[in-house]
Amino acid sequence: AYFPSVEIDGALYADGGLFAVAPDQVALHEAEHFMGIDVARVRMLSIGTATVGYQPAEGIDADAGAVGWLSDGRLILTLIAVQQQHVQAMMEDRLGARYLRLDAEWPADAALGIDIATPHAAQTLTALAARTVREIDRKPLKMFL
C-alpha cells in the first residue's frame, strides 16, 4: 500500500490496491454488468503506480526459497506485477486502441514497496508521474481527455 490507512467513523480503510491491484478489469465489469454499458462505447485511461515492471533489485537466486522471496516484499511485489500485466493484456485484447495505460518504469533504487507510505515514497511517485506525463505520446492520449 502506498497510502496509509484512514479511520472514518470508527472504521479503518486501507489502500484499495490491496483488493484490486489493477482495477481496470473491475471497472469494465461494473460498467458492463451493473450499468449496462456496451463495451464498444468504453474508453479506458489506466494510471499505474510503477509496479507493472517490478523486478527484485538484486535479482533472485534459483534456490532462494521462501526466505529469499519473502524478504523485501519480493513475492508480494512480483504477484502484484504479474496481476497488472495480466489485466493490462486482457484490457488491450478487449478494448484495443480504446485502452491506454500510463505507467512509469519501476525504479529499483527508489525505496518503494509494500507498506512504504512515507513522504519520500509520495515524492518519488509524484516525480515518476510527472516524468511519465512529460514523455507520453500526446496523440493517443487526446481521445481520453
Positions of the model-derived regions?
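Conserved catalytic cores and adjacent C-terminal regulatory segments
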Residues: A1-L145
